[in-house]
Amino acid sequence: MMSLSHATNPQPKPAAAPHTLAALLAAGGLAGKRVFIRADLNVPQDAAGAITDDTRIRASVPAIAACLQAGAAVMVTSHLGRPQEGAPDPRHSLAPVGRRLSELLGRQVPLLSGWTEGGFQVPPGQVVLLENCRMNTGEKKNSDELAQKMAALCDVYVNDAFGTAHRAEATTHGIARYAPIACAGPLLAAEIDALGKALGQPARPLVAIVAGSKVSTKLTILKSLADKVDNLIVGGGIANTFMLAAGLKIGKSLAEPDLLADARAIIDIMARRGASVPIPVDVVCAKEFSATAAATVKDVKDVADDDMILDIGPKTAAMLAEQLKAAGTIVWNGPVGVFEFDQFGNGTRVLAQAIAESKAFSIAGGGDTLAAIAKHGIADRVGYISTGGGAFLEFLEGKTLPALAVLAQRAAA
């Protein structure tokens, strides 16, 4: 297991390296201790609730298994989706996660609801899954009262959820202030180490793929990357907004016209540095958004008023693939089309294959990105797969992540 103290990253250096679970395990003494693990089990699900990619669940297993082997009484929780606080919601239950975790651990993992007040016992060497932490009132606002209640449940708090490290919530930040011992799990430590080493002095050209439905959710990151990367490939609704900014028609496609000035500014910043935001030359359109919609490839100048752009076209995909194959470092967050529907998945498939074939060091993160990697079977040909989404991108941007900061503060105290 890698220590946070060995990481070289763009973040401000903390006063002290956070304690790690690895160090606690090496020292012994976890036997009989109550260990509370905040994992990131926020996995994608289909309409029926079935898990479509279990990467994050599998990534959580090493910390859980190590604590069980050490004889600890283990409690694990995570968020799943965005349920309303204080209102149990079967649609956001961790039950499917619990079933998969049971299979991976080879033992039954009971699911407990209403757990914040305690009143339950976990025998040493056993594990329970605590229902979706975002159902607890005060979780998202980092309630001090809730944090203290949760801290009272444990002797050791372990944060093994890099994917939520950018959020100051009760299970990622508050509890770490009050638990008797607070430390970083192996996944969290490994994420920071790998990402930091990759970004210390990245091999050039540095190419980033940032895709998603809205520019607004990734505007700060896009602006930051505009100062760093050599090519900024945009996809999804984000690409539509950039196409509008470039004076192209996008029909009735998802876009944010109020952010055209920001998109143009990013294009200009890149151009002044001799870098680029490649704009699609062809796209795949449909008249409706559905799994059965007919797909039509069109040059960008031929997009009709009633068209929806749902993928990049084959010429654009080939052009971007060449950039990826020539890259020194690749950062990937987000599929470039509606890859869940096969007729709009070619762009993502071509870029995924190019990343797999590139000699560049590649790092990829984000739930949909993990699903695309799994779908195309390239996991063993991506340099490092991060289980973080927003945290992954904010780390790349160099922001201080609250969950890491509080662990560093505890270590320094």
Swiss-Prot record:
<dbReference type="InterPro" id="IPR015911">
    <property type="entry name" value="Phosphoglycerate_kinase_CS"/>
</dbReference>
<comment type="subunit">
    <text>Monomer.</text>
</comment>
<dbReference type="GO" id="GO:0004618">
    <property type="term" value="F:phosphoglycerate kinase activity"/>
</dbReference>
<feature type="binding site">
    <location>
        <position position="218"/>
    </location>
    <ligand>
        <name>ATP</name>
    </ligand>
</feature>
<dbReference type="GO" id="GO:0006094">
    <property type="term" value="P:gluconeogenesis"/>
</dbReference>
<keyword id="KW-0963">Cytoplasm</keyword>
<dbReference type="GO" id="GO:0005524">
    <property type="term" value="F:ATP binding"/>
</dbReference>
<dbReference type="InterPro" id="IPR001576">
    <property type="entry name" value="Phosphoglycerate_kinase"/>
</dbReference>
<keyword id="KW-0418">Kinase</keyword>
<feature type="binding site">
    <location>
        <begin position="366"/>
        <end position="369"/>
    </location>
    <ligand>
        <name>ATP</name>
    </ligand>
</feature>
<dbReference type="InterPro" id="IPR036043">
    <property type="entry name" value="Phosphoglycerate_kinase_sf"/>
</dbReference>
<comment type="similarity">
    <text>Belongs to the phosphoglycerate kinase family.</text>
</comment>
<feature type="binding site">
    <location>
        <position position="134"/>
    </location>
    <ligand>
        <name>substrate</name>
    </ligand>
</feature>
<keyword id="KW-0067">ATP-binding</keyword>
<keyword id="KW-0547">Nucleotide-binding</keyword>
<dbReference type="Pfam" id="PF00162">
    <property type="entry name" value="PGK"/>
</dbReference>
<feature type="binding site">
    <location>
        <position position="56"/>
    </location>
    <ligand>
        <name>substrate</name>
    </ligand>
</feature>
<dbReference type="GO" id="GO:0043531">
    <property type="term" value="F:ADP binding"/>
</dbReference>
<feature type="binding site">
    <location>
        <position position="340"/>
    </location>
    <ligand>
        <name>ATP</name>
    </ligand>
</feature>
<comment type="pathway">
    <text>Carbohydrate biosynthesis; Calvin cycle.</text>
</comment>
<keyword id="KW-0113">Calvin cycle</keyword>
<feature type="binding site">
    <location>
        <begin position="40"/>
        <end position="42"/>
    </location>
    <ligand>
        <name>substrate</name>
    </ligand>
</feature>
<protein>
    <recommendedName>
        <fullName>Phosphoglycerate kinase, chromosomal</fullName>
        <ecNumber>2.7.2.3</ecNumber>
    </recommendedName>
</protein>
<keyword id="KW-0808">Transferase</keyword>
<feature type="binding site">
    <location>
        <position position="167"/>
    </location>
    <ligand>
        <name>substrate</name>
    </ligand>
</feature>
<dbReference type="InterPro" id="IPR015824">
    <property type="entry name" value="Phosphoglycerate_kinase_N"/>
</dbReference>
<dbReference type="GO" id="GO:0005829">
    <property type="term" value="C:cytosol"/>
</dbReference>
<dbReference type="GO" id="GO:0006096">
    <property type="term" value="P:glycolytic process"/>
</dbReference>
<feature type="binding site">
    <location>
        <begin position="79"/>
        <end position="82"/>
    </location>
    <ligand>
        <name>substrate</name>
    </ligand>
</feature>
<dbReference type="GO" id="GO:0019253">
    <property type="term" value="P:reductive pentose-phosphate cycle"/>
</dbReference>
